[in-house]
């Protein structure tokens, strides 16, 4: 009996791994942040619950479907070879059904309890990640990183629109900030795992264009983040504290990126981790310094 229980627990754990809990957590945090900004700090608990549930299920379902699509190349990469599908601990067909089921539940919840527009944005996020990125572009072009950024940029917009009821300049500002942040964040990681991606035949920017072009594009995107990150201040979403913090964080981020660009290093996890701190500080300051 205990062996059955243990086996059942192991199966649950493997299915949980398929949903990429770390990424789902980040999606939920940015969605909640968007809701707080969209509601001007006056969150409705019931709406928050349904929005986070619907968005979380969509993110989890997309992660599962991504793993189903990538099961063959995941076997070839050291970083992903221990995932459930490459290991054979979960049947691909069952995983596919699981992923689709999560997506269906997500759409029903969003349409029933949140609204048509947020539901459409959730569907767009899933489509851009599963179809555009995972299925069509990831194995063919380094542009996949930028296109795939659409899905990662939408969670705060989904939260903002769910709370405010419309897509306005502030929602667009949140989208642009997330969209411009993702490529340089990923490219630094892609440099570290370039051999893994090359072995699997994935044309990430370091594999397809080399280290110099990757470092150059990382620098260009980081520089572009500076003006983009100030849009929430210019639109009146936040006040002076955010402006000061954003300027300081951008100068540090740009300085670290310039240092990396001119160095002989081919990877920089320090820059990768700072990019996470950068985003967290900016979003945190937005919430603290929001105009109510």
Curated annotation (Swiss-Prot):
CDD domains: PT_UbiA_Cox10. Its EC number is 2.5.1.141. The keyword Transferase applies. It catalyses: heme b + (2E,6E)-farnesyl diphosphate + H2O = Fe(II)-heme o + diphosphate. InterPro entries: Protohaem_IX_farnesylTrfase (IPR006369), UbiA_prenyltransferase (IPR000537), UbiA_prenylTrfase_CS (IPR030470), UbiA_sf (IPR044878). It is a multi-pass membrane protein. Pathway: Porphyrin-containing compound metabolism; heme O biosynthesis; heme O from protoheme: step 1/1. The chain crosses the membrane at residues 15-35, 49-69, 104-124, 147-167, 171-191, 218-238, 242-262, 271-291. One of its GO terms (biological process) is heme biosynthetic process. One of its GO terms (cellular component) is plasma membrane. Keywords: Cell inner membrane, Cell membrane, Heme biosynthesis, Membrane, Transferase, Transmembrane, Transmembrane helix. The keyword Cell division does not apply. It is found in: Cell inner membrane. One of its GO terms (molecular function) is protoheme IX farnesyltransferase activity. Converts heme B (protoheme IX) to heme O by substitution of the vinyl group on carbon 2 of heme B porphyrin ring with a hydroxyethyl farnesyl side group. NCBIfam families: cyoE_ctaB, PRK04375.1-2. Belongs to the UbiA prenyltransferase family. Protoheme IX farnesyltransferase subfamily. Carbon 2 of the heme B porphyrin ring is defined according to the Fischer nomenclature. This is Protoheme IX farnesyltransferase. It comes from Aquifex aeolicus (strain VF5). The gene is ctaB.
């Amino acid at each position: 009996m205990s062996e059955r229980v243990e086996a059942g627990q192991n199966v649950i754990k493997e299915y949980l791994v398929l949903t990429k809990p770390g990424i789902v957590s980040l999606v939920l945090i940015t969605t909640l942040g968007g809701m707080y900004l969209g509601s001007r700090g006056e969150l409705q608990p019931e709406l928050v619950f349904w929005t986070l549930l619907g968005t979380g299920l969509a993110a989890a379902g997309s992660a599962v479907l991504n793993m189903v699509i990538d099961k063959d190349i995941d076997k070839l990469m050291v970083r992903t070879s221990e995932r459930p599908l490459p290991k054979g601990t979960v049947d691909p067909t069952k995983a596919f059904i699981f992923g689709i089921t999560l997506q269906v539940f997500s759409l029903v919840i969003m349409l029933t309890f949140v609204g048509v527009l947020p539901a459409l944005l959730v569907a767009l996020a899933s489509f851009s990640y599963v179809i555009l990125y995972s299925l069509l572009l990831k194995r063919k072009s380094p542009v996949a990183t930028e296109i795939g950024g659409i899905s990662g940029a939408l969670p705060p917009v989904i939260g903002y629109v769910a709370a405010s009821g419309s897509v306005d300049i502030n929602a667009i500002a949140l989208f642009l900030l997330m969209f411009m942040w993702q490529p340089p964040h990923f490219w630094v990681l892609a440099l570290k795992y370039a051999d893994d991606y090359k072995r699997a035949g994935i044309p990430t920017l370091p594999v397809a264009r080399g280290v110099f072009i990757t470092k150059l594009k990382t620098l260009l995107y980081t520089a572009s983040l500076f003006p983009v990150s100030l849009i929430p201040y210019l639109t009146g979403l936040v006040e002076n504290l955010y402006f000061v913090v954003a300027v300081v964080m951008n100068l540090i981020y740009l300085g670290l990126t310039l240092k990396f660009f001119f160095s002989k290093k081919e990877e920089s996890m320090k820059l990768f981790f700072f990019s996470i701190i950068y985003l967290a500080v900016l979003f945190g300051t937005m919430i603290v310094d929001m105009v109510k």
